[in-house]
């Protein structure tokens, strides 16, 4: 398993944008052009090119030759490389991607003030109770820990919104370990959280517990 991250410390230059756009599919180029906010376009573009960059090095392929598709519930995949599993997430200034030989999910969230009503509506009873038990000044952080962990699990499953958020429970313990409460019939999975930046929460979900200790940072220049 490998996890890569791009920190968008500056906007893409026109030259970088044009070069990256040349790597991606016509459909993705059109999607990027339709974004109202340039930052949204850049996040989407960088996520696509990051995957292409990693896959091209691993399999000796040209970036522009990699063909993406989607699975039944919309999870991106590479049909020609069925063992190359990946997942992308972006929020704020971060674009991150996880790679593994088995299905994997990743999520990053920029924290902001929350309403506990959202937690009551979407979280399991156990998770909501855990959240309420936190001190007031810890509740926002724990909310985003829960949200990113749950999103990473849903993305690892690859079933999208067909899997209700309250159908399973996650808990982040004081020692940093994560426990998951799943139906007995469900195959084992594991979650690890990462502290990449103050004001962000990130989690990865995989079919095995062999997580890297850190993420590998990638610069714009390394993608060219």
From Swiss-Prot:
GO annotation, cellular component aspect: cytosol
Residue ranges of the region described as Peptidyl carrier protein binding: 158-189
Cofactors demanded by this protein = Mg(2+)
Q: Name one GO biological process term.
A: positive regulation of single-species biofilm formation
**Reaction it catalyzes:** apo-[ACP] + CoA = holo-[ACP] + adenosine 3',5'-bisphosphate + H(+)
Could you give a GO molecular-function term held by this entry? magnesium ion binding
Q: Which SUPFAM superfamilies match?
A: 4'-phosphopantetheinyl transferase
Q: Does the keyword Phosphoprotein apply?
A: no
EC assignment: 2.7.8.7
Q: Which InterPro entries match?
A: 4-PPantetheinyl_Trfase_dom, 4-PPantetheinyl_Trfase_dom_sf, AASDHPPT_N, P-Pant_transferase_sf, Ppantetheine-prot_Trfase_dom
Q: Where does Mg(2+) bind?
A: 107, 109, 151
Keywords carried by this UniProt record: Antibiotic biosynthesis, Magnesium, Metal-binding, Transferase
Outcome of mutating residue 151 to A: Loss of activity
Do you know which Pfam families this protein is assigned to?
AASDHPPT_N (PF22624), ACPS (PF01648)
Result for mutant: residue 147 to F: 5-fold reduction in activity, but no change in substrate affinity
How does pH shape activity? Optimum pH is 6.0. Displays less than 20% of Vmax at both pH 5.0 and pH 7.0.
Q: Which PANTHER family match?
A: L-AMINOADIPATE-SEMIALDEHYDE DEHYDROGENASE-PHOSPHOPANTETHEINYL TRANSFERASE (PTHR12215:SF10), PHOSPHOPANTETHEINE TRANSFERASE (PTHR12215)
> What family does the entry list?
Belongs to the P-Pant transferase superfamily. Gsp/Sfp/HetI/AcpT family.
Quaternary assembly? Monomer in solution.
Instruction: State what this protein does.
Output: Activates the seven peptidyl carrier protein (PCP) domains of the first three subunits (SrfAA, SrfAB and SrfAC) of surfactin synthetase by transferring the 4'-phosphopantetheinyl moiety of coenzyme A (CoA) to a serine residue. Required for cells of B.subtilis to become producers of the lipopeptide antibiotics surfactin and plipastatin B1.
For this entry, the protein name equals 4'-phosphopantetheinyl transferase Sfp
């Amino acid at each position: 398993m490998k996890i890569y991250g791009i920190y968008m410390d500056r906007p893409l230059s026109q030259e970088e944008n044009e070069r990256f756009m040349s790597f991606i599919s016509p459909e993705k180029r059109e999607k990027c052009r339709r974004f109202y906010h340039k930052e949204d376009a850049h996040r989407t573009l960088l996520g696509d090119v990051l995957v292409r960059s990693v896959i091209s090095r691993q399999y000796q392929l040209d970036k522009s030759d990699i063909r993406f598709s989607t699975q039944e519930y919309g999870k991106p995949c590479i049909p020609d490389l069925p063992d190359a599993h990946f997942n992308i997430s972006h929020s704020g200034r971060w674009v991150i991607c996880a790679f593994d030989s088995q299905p994997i999910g990743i999520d990053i969230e920029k924290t902001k003030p929350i309403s506990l009503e959202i937690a009551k509506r979407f979280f399991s009873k156990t998770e909501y109770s855990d959240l309420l038990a936190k001190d007031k000044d810890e509740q926002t952080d724990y909310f985003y820990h829960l949200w990113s962990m749950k999103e990473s699990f849903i993305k690892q499953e690859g079933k999208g919104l067909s899997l209700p958020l309250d159908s399973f429970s996650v808990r982040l313990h004081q020692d940093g370990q994560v426990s998951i409460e799943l139906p007995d019939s469900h195959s084992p999975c594991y979650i690890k959280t990462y502290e990449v930046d103050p004001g962000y929460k990130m989690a990865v979900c995989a079919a095995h517990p062999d997580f890297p200790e850190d993420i590998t940072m990638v610069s714009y220049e390394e993608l060219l």
